[in-house]
A protein has these predicted regions:
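A hydrophobic/aromatic-rich effector-binding and dimerization subdomain
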Residues: 2-11, 15-19, 24-30, 49-50, ...
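N-terminal accessory regions of nucleic-acid-interacting proteins
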Residues: 32-39
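N-terminal regulatory/effector-sensing and dimerization cores
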Residues: 60-161, 207
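An amphipathic alpha-helical interaction segment
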Residues: 179-230
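N-terminal positioning helix adjacent to the helix-turn-helix/winged-helix DNA-binding module
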Residues: 184, 236-244, 279, 288-291
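Basic/polar phosphate-binding segments, predominantly the helix-turn-helix DNA-binding elements
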Residues: 250-254, 258-293, 298-302
């Protein structure tokens, strides 16, 4: 990690200084409220939960109050309780150091260093006071950018990517949040560190670099989620579908439904049932989709 970026991440902001000295924010009652599933919740004012970094390395630097056209990147304030609230946006939390105890839709979760948490819109959650070494960064995609644009792009890449995007969306729709067990992942901290360095010491192409790093982070989180599923997630009892999709993706030009069934020692009918259940598409539809996407990619390159 760049020492300058580490310094700016860990330096107390003026608001954090006040919270550490005992100041308690009392403006929650003045925030707008919204009915959600029969319960009234506070809609969080983003400027309260997140700490602006006043000691920026340069006047033009966004620090960790980076406001881009599609995403915002902010540091969560330490030493202050954030009571139960909801957002009108999706939020992605990353713990740079320490840990972060939260209650998400009634479920206590302690987010550990290098883990990532995706919180859906209108999901009630609260955050316990963060300590001196507890640094959590929030990435806030604008409107429906994450699902309507970025996830759609991944879905178009391959049948396997489409499967994982569908799984992530279904999990988030059902539970309203998704924890990525990325604490031992090699790439996630590396990509986030590069993102922070670009925020604190922006280059000429800073906006493009930040957006591409965000895209890369989301791509790696799909890999993390695949690992979670294969090791014992909600699809573990039918985890054969993951290697099956990978096999089809690699051999779509020559494989048949029968050859896929033979390779995995199951019946051709079971191939179709599995694929339909977990992807919503038949074997033929998946192969055709892969062929069309491959052709489209070739056309883009010519």
């Amino acid at each position: 990690m760049n020492l300058k970026a580490h310094h700016y991440l860990t330096t107390l902001s003026p608001s954090e200084e006040k919270y550490r000295n005992g100041y308690v924010y009392d403006g929650w009652k003045d925030m707008p409220r919204k009915q959600c599933n029969g319960v009234e919740y506070t809609i969080l004012d983003l400027d309260v939960a997140y700490s602006p970094l006043d000691n920026k390395p340069a006047d033009h630097s966004p620090g960790l109050n980076a406001e881009l056209s599609e995403i915002s990147i902010k540091k969560n304030s330490r030493f202050s309780t954030v009571p139960e609230h909801i957002h009108t946006h999706i939020e992605i939390n990353y713990v740079y150091s320490g840990s972060c105890p939260q209650v998400i839709d009634g479920h206590p979760i302690t987010l550990q260093k290098n883990q990532v948490l995706l919180i859906d819109t209108n999901c009630p959650h609260s955050i316990a006071p963060l300590g001196e070494n507890d640094i959590m960064i929030s990435i806030i995609p604008k409107t429906d950018f994450l699902r309507e644009h970025m996830f759609n792009q991944f879905s178009n890449d391959s049948i396997l990517s489409r499967f994982f995007i569908n799984a992530i969306n279904e999990k988030t729709d059902h539970d309203h949040y998704l924890l990525f067990h990325s604490e031992n992942d090699r790439r996630i901290p590396m990509f986030f560190n590069e993102l922070f360095c670009e925020c604190f010491d922006p280059s000429i192409n800073s906006t493009d670099i930040i957006m591409h790093l965000f895209y890369t982070i989301m791509a790696e989180l799909i890999n993390v989620y695949e690992d979670d599923l294969t090791k014992g997630g909600s699809y573990s009892h039918n985890s054969i579908v993951i290697p099956m999709l990978r096999y089809m993706e690699r051999n779509f030009r020559t494989c048949t439904q029968e050859s896929v069934a033979d390779f995995f020692h199951i019946s051709p009918n079971y191939v179709t049932r599995l694929l339909k259940k977990y992807t919503g598409m038949t074997y033929i539809q998946l192969i055709q989709a892969q062929k069309l996407q491959t052709a489209a990619n070739l056309l883009k390159q010519t």
